[in-house]
Amino acid sequence: MKKVIAITGPTASGKTSLSIKIAKKFNLEIINCDSLQMYQKYDIGTAKITIEEAQGIKHHLLDFLTPGTNYNIYYFQKDARKKIEEMPLPLFVGGSGLYLKSVLFDYELTPKSLFLPPISLTAIENMVDFIKKKDPQLIANLDLKNPRRILSAYQDLLSGTLRSQKNKKHNPLYSSLIFYLDIDRQILKKRVILRLEQMLKKGFIEEVNQIQTFFPNANFNIIGYREIKVLLEGKITLDQAKTLIIQKTMQYAKRQKTWFKNQIKPMILDALSPDLEKTTIGLINNFLKTD
């Protein structure tokens, strides 16, 4: 099997910094695995890597879609697998777990619901409530930041199918070394708060305003962008928006960790360890020695 490496973890856990160090050490190119960072203009609010931060490391499937473009996990699976075949040793970086799993495992996808019109936030919330009642086990594994995944699960339940009880293929297609950067929840919260303040200083509110102005069909059902949009509509204050963003980010991080541990079973690393880089390099060297 072809070897693949992935670095995952919650927002503000240090994925970007570690990935650049690893890419430079092993002369690798990076495949982005953050579903939001694939879109242009969503820069500040997604903490998208900058040219300076990339330090010359080539990134694929990053910043290549116009806001509002119909692109989802179905297309990503195909594009990412093509990239894997083009690289000696691909390095995936990002926290979109289902996207990563769809690529690395024998995950069957169909292009259904690719060209549906935008879904309102109220409709999404109603669908989530319905899913919780009908199939509670599914919620822990569902990407609640992705309206299309919510709609797909909702449609399955309407047809009488409990998706959590489906027999899916989980056979690996590649020999994968997947790292998950774990971090103490209280420290993570402090980092999230600090990062949000930095985003606001960099112009996060103006970024949302620009996207809304020039791309009215763009997706705003995203943590951070949704709250800033509501702020711009005058429905909440800045302090309320900040509180909501922090709260929802932490809730998502908790679900994210549960999902990765149950679905992918990655190698969990201490994101705050002073030996993180050294440990990661050692594990990769051992991985590359195996057949």
Swiss-Prot record:
HAMAP family: IPP_trans (MF_00185). It comes from Aster yellows witches'-broom phytoplasma (strain AYWB). This is tRNA dimethylallyltransferase. Belongs to the IPP transferase family. One of its GO terms (molecular function) is tRNA dimethylallyltransferase activity. The record marks S96 as: Interaction with substrate tRNA. The keyword Signal does not apply. Substrate binds at T11, A12, S13, G14, K15, T16. It is an enzyme of class 2 (transferase). Its EC number is 2.5.1.75. The keyword Nucleotide-binding applies. It catalyses: adenosine(37) in tRNA + dimethylallyl diphosphate = N(6)-dimethylallyladenosine(37) in tRNA + diphosphate.
